[in-house]
Amino acid sequence: LKCNKLIPLAYKTCPAGKDLCYKMYMVSDKTVPVKRGCIDVCPKNSLLVKYECCNTDRCN
């Protein structure tokens, strides 16, 4: 699986066991992702942070 880094022009290949890509936003500003990468389990959203997870190459 390949996931985009913070700047979508760059991406990385995920290590074994991390088979989801994620994108993290601040709830107050959903237009600009704060973090992107590989993850094993999609975190729950909180009052401050929203996560979007997916499982295809460069889907984040």
Curated annotation (Swiss-Prot):
Tissues showing expression: Expressed by the venom gland.
A GO term, aspect molecular function: toxin activity
Subcellular location: Secreted; Target cell membrane
SUPFAM superfamilies for the chain: Snake toxin-like (SSF57302)
GO biological process, one term: killing of cells of another organism
InterPro entries: Cytotoxin_Cobra, Snake_3FTx, Snake_toxin-like_sf, Snake_toxin_con_site, Toxin_cobra-type
Keywords: Cardiotoxin, Cytolysis, Disulfide bond, Membrane, Secreted, Target cell membrane, Target membrane, Toxin
Gene Ontology CC terms: extracellular region; membrane; other organism cell membrane
Disulfide feature: 3-21, 14-38, 42-53, 54-59
A Pfam family assignment: Toxin_cobra-type
Gene3D superfamilies named among the record's database cross-references: CD59 (2.10.60.10)
Described purpose of this protein according to its UniProt entry: Shows cytolytic activity on many different cells by forming pore in lipid membranes. In vivo, increases heart rate or kills the animal by cardiac arrest. In addition, it binds to heparin with high affinity, interacts with Kv channel-interacting protein 1 (KCNIP1) in a calcium-independent manner, and binds to integrin alpha-V/beta-3 (ITGAV/ITGB3) with moderate affinity. Has hemolytic activity towards human erythrocytes (EC(50)=0.074 uM) and cytolytic activity towards various cell lines.
Assembly information from the UniProt record: Monomer in solution; Homodimer and oligomer in the presence of negatively charged lipids forming a pore with a size ranging between 20 and 30 Angstroms.
Similarity section: Belongs to the three-finger toxin family. Short-chain subfamily. Type IA cytotoxin sub-subfamily.
Protein name stated in the entry: Cytotoxin 8
Species of the source: Naja naja (Indian cobra)
